[in-house]
Amino acid sequence: MTNRTASLRRETSESGIELSLDLDGTGASEIHTSVPFYDHLLTAFAKHSLTDLRVRASGDTEIDVHHTVEDVGIVLGQAIRQALGDKAGLSRYGDALVPLDEALVQAVVDLSGRPYLVHAGEPSGFEFHLIGGHFTGSMVRHVFEAISFNAAITTHVTVVGGRDPHHIAEAEFKAFARAFRQAKAYDPLVSGIPSTKGAL
């Protein structure tokens, strides 16, 4: 079994990102994005996916947090893709249904090699809510888009119910984390790459 790790840096005129991860970790994290609620969400992702994650990011947050939030998602997706390797022996698929008080979210992940996102069910107006002083609800979709397209995975995230924007966003990240944890796990019954095509 090879080490499933990745370390990446990304510098643009809008942000600077340093990120490292270990897919076979314990959920340890050290997250500093300069966007506190985003730190909270990424910490939850690491904990519930059992991925060790270190992120240090800076950006033009005096303009908006959008660039920093999306760019971290891009680098996280790239790191996941690199660390997964050829995906031989993996379960490939994962699903989870996660509550957080009144919020309930379902997530399904396929390490398909085909980037796709279906994101549905957030209550009307959710995207305009400001959570934690900096993070708007619309950022949640941007993060899942960035991760899914750069990791080349198929992701479905569906909000089944919920009222509190904090609870909904956090449940989305936790559900995605639990589904990803299943998908990236080794399956002792799987020999080779889990696809009839022979590649993912």
Swiss-Prot record:
One GO term (biological process): L-histidine biosynthetic process
Gene Ontology CC terms, in alphabetical order: cytoplasm
EC number: 4.2.1.19
Reactions the enzyme catalyzes: D-erythro-1-(imidazol-4-yl)glycerol 3-phosphate = 3-(imidazol-4-yl)-2-oxopropyl phosphate + H2O
Domain of life: Bacteria
One Pfam assignment: IGPD
Localization in the cell: Cytoplasm
Gene Ontology MF terms: imidazoleglycerol-phosphate dehydratase activity
Functional pathway: Amino-acid biosynthesis; L-histidine biosynthesis; L-histidine from 5-phospho-alpha-D-ribose 1-diphosphate: step 6/9
Signal peptide span: none
Keyword Transit peptide: no
Record keywords, A-Z: Amino-acid biosynthesis, Cytoplasm, Histidine biosynthesis, Lyase
Family: Belongs to the imidazoleglycerol-phosphate dehydratase family.
NCBIfam families tied to this protein: PRK00951.1-6 (NF002110), PRK00951.2-1 (NF002111), PRK00951.2-4 (NF002114)
Protein name (Swiss-Prot/TrEMBL): Imidazoleglycerol-phosphate dehydratase
Species of origin: Leifsonia xyli subsp. xyli (strain CTCB07)
Lineage: Bacteria, Bacillati, Actinomycetota, Actinomycetes, Micrococcales
